[in-house]
């Protein structure tokens, strides 16, 4: 059975707070770009960009990052098929930019490690910060988020499910027992 952690309004408030934190920490939005990790990170990045536009009256580029080829588990025998790989083109140059990498859930850190590898293959940004909607702990790598919507301590037999309207038809965060 799933336990609701955030409804759509709480999720919106968390993203708004994260947006303010991004502005404050960076003293504005100069040279800022957002890169969402597919799939849900892309939609969260776009929502942050929309809020930045409302607050700062300026567009911030948003790109999407497919980390499929960079995952350290892609050769796992339990994966039934070869990965589908999309072009690694963000649509803008990240050289000397301040990149905010956006994802839905931070767990072991392996997805973020893969995303950092992918970003470095694309270009050399001036700085990279990490924004996640949920930090659930249980890190296997020394990775920490700079902007967090909600810290949710979890057990290993639990799963955090983030829903975004663009993919799932609703917004929210649930905690599920496996």
Swiss-Prot record:
Its EC number is 2.4.2.9. It catalyses: UMP + diphosphate = 5-phospho-alpha-D-ribose 1-diphosphate + uracil. GO terms for molecular function: RNA binding; uracil phosphoribosyltransferase activity. One of its GO terms (biological process) is DNA-templated transcription termination. It is an enzyme of class 2 (transferase). A motif (PRPP-binding) lies at residues 99-111. InterPro entries: PRibTrfase_dom, PRTase-like, PyrR, PyrR_bifunctional. It comes from the Bacteria. Keywords: Glycosyltransferase, RNA-binding, Transcription, Transcription regulation, Transcription termination, Transferase. Regulates transcriptional attenuation of the pyrimidine nucleotide (pyr) operon by binding in a uridine-dependent manner to specific sites on pyr mRNA. This disrupts an antiterminator hairpin in the RNA and favors formation of a downstream transcription terminator, leading to a reduced expression of downstream genes. Also displays a weak uracil phosphoribosyltransferase activity which is not physiologically significant. Homodimer and homohexamer; in equilibrium. Belongs to the purine/pyrimidine phosphoribosyltransferase family. PyrR subfamily. This is Bifunctional protein PyrR. The gene is pyrR.
């Amino acid at each position: 059975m799933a336990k609701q952690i955030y409804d759509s309004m709480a999720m919106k408030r968390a993203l708004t707070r994260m947006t303010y934190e991004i502005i404050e920490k960076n003293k504005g939005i100069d040279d800022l770009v957002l890169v969402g990790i597919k799939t849900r990170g892309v939609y969260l990045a776009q929502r942050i960009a929309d809020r930045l536009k409302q607050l700062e009256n300026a567009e911030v580029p948003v790109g999407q990052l497919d980390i499929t080829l960079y995952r350290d588990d892609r050769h796992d025998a339990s994966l039934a098929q070869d990965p589908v790989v999309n072009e690694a083109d963000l649509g803008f140059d990240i050289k000397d930019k301040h990149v905010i990498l956006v994802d839905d859930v931070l767990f072991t850190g392996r997805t973020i490690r893969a995303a950092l590898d992918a970003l470095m293959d694309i270009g050399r940004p001036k700085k990279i910060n990490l924004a996640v909607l949920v930090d659930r702990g249980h890190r296997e790598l020394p990775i920490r988020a700079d902007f967090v919507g909600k810290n949710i301590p979890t057990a290993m037999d639990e799963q955090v499910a983030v829903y975004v309207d663009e993919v799932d038809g609703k917004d929210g965060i649930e905690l599920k027992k496996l």
